[in-house]
């Protein structure tokens, strides 16, 4: 399976700064740190942050998934524009309890997004909790209060440095959402009904397009399947 590969977790001073499937994420984070240092050298702002140890560790997918369930927002260290950080925060809210996570940490900026993602499925697909987390790009852009800027939001999604924990894989094309909704409606019309029938139909339908993913379309599909099979999450 695609998820069976090794995952690289990059930490700075203990905080998670990147998760990917190869060590290029370490180079990317190191480059961002070097850029910030060059900016500070050229222009003192009075808000300089001194970073300590940066390290990368190869782990299995189960450990990444465990981190996804355990970490809080303040356990992350994000580098990017304010807009990108807003989008990443909104992605985080798709799978995490906003009320229990506190505010946006200092290194994310102080102009965070307002509101939270509801769990009633009204903007998503219907069906079980996992499938309700799936959302199309235009609806997610609206959650980011930027429906007219779908491309900009999609670009920020693609630059997400912390895969799985910040679940960018849950944003899929509208055609995929429509297909899943059709499957759900058909399942509800049978005498069996229930989420199990709906999930089974979704997992077996290879025609559903879950869209592009920086780590590969096959891996994106497996991550979504994992979401649907882990009902307790």
Model features per residue range: what roles?
Residues 1-147, 186-193, 199, 203-204, ...:
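Basic nucleic-acid-binding alpha-helical/helix-turn surface characteristic of O6-alkylguanine DNA
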Residues 146-218, 222:
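Short glycine/serine-rich loop segments
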